[in-house]
């Protein structure tokens, strides 16, 4: 957390004022398994990156946004996970971290809306990245069997297509919106 302010200062000295932050910090549970066996060090590791890192990075960027007049639209975009709202007891630390990051996004949205800064949350589902490599084999058949109504893994470009209108202000009145990017995975089914 101590490195956040110097990092943002360095970025702004090189690139100019930040108008959009996409907070995409995320690490999986170090050890998947029974939540009753989670060790404090593993819990802290996941929450330090997935929650504390995202929160304090957004806080510093928001402070800097508020410290200068705006000529461009400004936005904070939190990339959390469908796990913010879909519990998995074998990855409880991850789910807890993403649920807390979701609440942080909502709090920032309420705080920054009067200042004209949009805050959004994206909840990716099963996205084909390095982070999903270890779960790919066990989810292929489940996806083919209907777990994801769209019938496929999400791609990083699916996230990008949602981020762009948020960053450009095309969704400014939707501040605080939670947008699932999961091919229908999180749709409740009966």
Spell out what each predicted region is.
Residues 4, 32-35, 39-44, 144:
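Substrate-binding pocket helix/loop in short-chain dehydrogenase/reductase
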Residues 32, 164, 175-190:
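Short C-terminal tail/terminal secondary-structure segment
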Residues 73, 113, 118, 174-176:
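Short, small/polar-rich loop/turn modules that mediate ligand/substrate recognition or access, typified
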Residues 148-159:
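A conserved structural motif in NAD(P)-dependent oxidoreductases
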């Amino acid at each position: 957390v101590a490195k956040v302010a110097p990092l943002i200062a360095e970025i702004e000295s090189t690139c100019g004022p930040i108008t959009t932050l996409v907070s995409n910090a995320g690490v999986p549970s170090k050890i998947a398994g029974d939540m009753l066996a989670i060790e404090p060090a593993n819990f802290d590791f996941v929450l330090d990156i997935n929650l504390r890192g995202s929160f304090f990075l957004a806080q510093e960027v928001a402070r800097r946004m508020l410290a200068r007049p705006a000529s461009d639209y400004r936005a904070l975009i939190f990339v959390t996970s469908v796990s913010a709202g879909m519990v998995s007891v074998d990855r409880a630390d991850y789910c807890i971290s993403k649920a807390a990051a979701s609440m942080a996004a909502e709090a920032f949205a309420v705080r920054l809306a009067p200042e004209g800064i949009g805050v959004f949350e994206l909840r990716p589902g099963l996205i084909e990245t390095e982070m999903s490599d270890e779960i790919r084999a066990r989810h292929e058949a489940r996806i083919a069997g209907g777990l994801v109504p769209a019938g496929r893994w999400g791609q990083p470009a699916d996230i990008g297509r949602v981020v762009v209108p948020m960053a450009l202000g095309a969704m400014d009145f939707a501040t605080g919106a939670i947008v699932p990017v999961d091919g229908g995975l999180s749709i409740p089914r009966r």
